Amino acid sequence: MKRLAVLGSTGSIGTQTLDIVRKYRDRLEVSLLAASRVSEKLLDQIDEFKPEYVYIAEGEKIKGVKTLIGEDGLYKLAQLDIDLFINGISGINGILPTYLLLENNKKLATANKEAIICLGEIYGDKYSDIFPIDSEHSAIFQCLLSGRKEEVEKIILTASGGPFLNLPKEEFRYITPDQALNHPRWKMGKKVSIDSATLMNKGFEIIEAHYLFNIPYSKIDVVIHPESIVHGLVQFIDGSVISHLSPPDMRIPICYAISYPERWEIDVRRLNLAQVKNLTFLEPDYDRFPLLNIAKECGEKGGACPTVLTTADEIAVNLFLEGKITFDMIPVYIQQVLDQADFSKPETFEDIIFIIKETEKIFWNILKLQNVN
């Protein structure tokens, strides 16, 4: 019986993880559920899966279950004897639990890009033990099994292009949050859906791939693939290319992260290539989606830059979702913050937290000067 901790259990990754648990109750046991707060959904999960522990970021103890609360609770969470921690927390909130789990040498499967990116400068040497849940990085992981690292010529990440792949740039300012959240292929949370619409998500994945697989940026490419069938490719020095194909369903990489090195049957739509008919691959349009290049440049620069990028993006996305800035201004504000930020390379976790807080101050000062409330 494999014991799981599901961090972000009420979110998109968490609920799909629990779908896998439902199918394999004879193999999987939920030891801990973690969420930001008590909700009806969390209480329903507790009732169904009966974990020994529950973590909430804030609130009161939950009757009938060992409850861990706040930052002190996170430190206790990271010391629990659990076989696999699944981090489905969205955004910068996923950084501290990731740091603590790495510090305690816990087995971790994660979908939290921000933590991988921000902690990469100081914890990259521990990333070889992390199992990626992202469909693209799960695909690359599997493709890399076909050869040795020194035989890899390049890796290729695919991007759907999001809901605005063919929308003229001059219309970006009129995009609404509801339109941006309506991804044509994937069912995701709000933050990652907006990042997919701006292609920042793919920019993050470039940096993530660099850290997870210890691959230089010069060997990481991106192509637009609207069908979202091919999730990643690896080209080897003999000219061969190994690719990973599957229907666009996050339960596939989640289940693989749980079952590895085995593969377990799951109830997802099977791929029928005759019905797919066409697989399209396009060069990214860096003019319409500048965050892709901005992210890669931040990764290449290293130091504090990736942390500044993730912090600025999180604020910009939230402002857009709140209707305070337009869609086309997301990359503009992020670039303005990057231009003003000047921090030393982080050496400790405390340095990363300092960079995050100072970046937030820079962003809010920019907004204040431009009378954005």
UniProtKB/Swiss-Prot annotation:
<feature type="binding site">
    <location>
        <position position="196"/>
    </location>
    <ligand>
        <name>1-deoxy-D-xylulose 5-phosphate</name>
    </ligand>
</feature>
<feature type="binding site">
    <location>
        <position position="114"/>
    </location>
    <ligand>
        <name>NADPH</name>
    </ligand>
</feature>
<feature type="binding site">
    <location>
        <position position="189"/>
    </location>
    <ligand>
        <name>NADPH</name>
    </ligand>
</feature>
<feature type="binding site">
    <location>
        <position position="135"/>
    </location>
    <ligand>
        <name>1-deoxy-D-xylulose 5-phosphate</name>
    </ligand>
</feature>
<feature type="binding site">
    <location>
        <position position="160"/>
    </location>
    <ligand>
        <name>1-deoxy-D-xylulose 5-phosphate</name>
    </ligand>
</feature>
<feature type="binding site">
    <location>
        <position position="136"/>
    </location>
    <ligand>
        <name>Mn(2+)</name>
    </ligand>
</feature>
<feature type="binding site">
    <location>
        <position position="202"/>
    </location>
    <ligand>
        <name>1-deoxy-D-xylulose 5-phosphate</name>
    </ligand>
</feature>
<keyword id="KW-0479">Metal-binding</keyword>
<dbReference type="InterPro" id="IPR013644">
    <property type="entry name" value="DXP_reductoisomerase_C"/>
</dbReference>
<feature type="binding site">
    <location>
        <position position="134"/>
    </location>
    <ligand>
        <name>Mn(2+)</name>
    </ligand>
</feature>
<comment type="pathway">
    <text>Isoprenoid biosynthesis; isopentenyl diphosphate biosynthesis via DXP pathway; isopentenyl diphosphate from 1-deoxy-D-xylulose 5-phosphate: step 1/6.</text>
</comment>
<dbReference type="GO" id="GO:0051484">
    <property type="term" value="P:isopentenyl diphosphate biosynthetic process, methylerythritol 4-phosphate pathway involved in terpenoid biosynthetic process"/>
</dbReference>
<dbReference type="Pfam" id="PF02670">
    <property type="entry name" value="DXP_reductoisom"/>
</dbReference>
<comment type="function">
    <text>Catalyzes the NADPH-dependent rearrangement and reduction of 1-deoxy-D-xylulose-5-phosphate (DXP) to 2-C-methyl-D-erythritol 4-phosphate (MEP).</text>
</comment>
<keyword id="KW-0560">Oxidoreductase</keyword>
<feature type="binding site">
    <location>
        <position position="13"/>
    </location>
    <ligand>
        <name>NADPH</name>
    </ligand>
</feature>
<feature type="binding site">
    <location>
        <position position="136"/>
    </location>
    <ligand>
        <name>1-deoxy-D-xylulose 5-phosphate</name>
    </ligand>
</feature>
<feature type="binding site">
    <location>
        <position position="113"/>
    </location>
    <ligand>
        <name>1-deoxy-D-xylulose 5-phosphate</name>
    </ligand>
</feature>
<protein>
    <recommendedName>
        <fullName>1-deoxy-D-xylulose 5-phosphate reductoisomerase</fullName>
        <ecNumber>1.1.1.267</ecNumber>
    </recommendedName>
</protein>
<dbReference type="InterPro" id="IPR036291">
    <property type="entry name" value="NAD(P)-bd_dom_sf"/>
</dbReference>
<dbReference type="InterPro" id="IPR036169">
    <property type="entry name" value="DXPR_C_sf"/>
</dbReference>
<dbReference type="InterPro" id="IPR013512">
    <property type="entry name" value="DXP_reductoisomerase_N"/>
</dbReference>
<dbReference type="GO" id="GO:0030145">
    <property type="term" value="F:manganese ion binding"/>
</dbReference>
<feature type="binding site">
    <location>
        <position position="37"/>
    </location>
    <ligand>
        <name>NADPH</name>
    </ligand>
</feature>
<keyword id="KW-0414">Isoprene biosynthesis</keyword>
<feature type="binding site">
    <location>
        <position position="183"/>
    </location>
    <ligand>
        <name>1-deoxy-D-xylulose 5-phosphate</name>
    </ligand>
</feature>
<feature type="binding site">
    <location>
        <position position="12"/>
    </location>
    <ligand>
        <name>NADPH</name>
    </ligand>
</feature>
<dbReference type="Pfam" id="PF08436">
    <property type="entry name" value="DXP_redisom_C"/>
</dbReference>
<feature type="binding site">
    <location>
        <position position="205"/>
    </location>
    <ligand>
        <name>1-deoxy-D-xylulose 5-phosphate</name>
    </ligand>
</feature>
<feature type="binding site">
    <location>
        <position position="205"/>
    </location>
    <ligand>
        <name>Mn(2+)</name>
    </ligand>
</feature>
<dbReference type="InterPro" id="IPR003821">
    <property type="entry name" value="DXP_reductoisomerase"/>
</dbReference>
<keyword id="KW-0521">NADP</keyword>
<feature type="binding site">
    <location>
        <position position="10"/>
    </location>
    <ligand>
        <name>NADPH</name>
    </ligand>
</feature>
<dbReference type="InterPro" id="IPR026877">
    <property type="entry name" value="DXPR_C"/>
</dbReference>
<keyword id="KW-0464">Manganese</keyword>
<feature type="binding site">
    <location>
        <position position="112"/>
    </location>
    <ligand>
        <name>NADPH</name>
    </ligand>
</feature>
<dbReference type="Pfam" id="PF13288">
    <property type="entry name" value="DXPR_C"/>
</dbReference>
<comment type="similarity">
    <text>Belongs to the DXR family.</text>
</comment>
<feature type="binding site">
    <location>
        <position position="201"/>
    </location>
    <ligand>
        <name>1-deoxy-D-xylulose 5-phosphate</name>
    </ligand>
</feature>
<feature type="binding site">
    <location>
        <position position="11"/>
    </location>
    <ligand>
        <name>NADPH</name>
    </ligand>
</feature>
<dbReference type="GO" id="GO:0030604">
    <property type="term" value="F:1-deoxy-D-xylulose-5-phosphate reductoisomerase activity"/>
</dbReference>
<dbReference type="GO" id="GO:0070402">
    <property type="term" value="F:NADPH binding"/>
</dbReference>
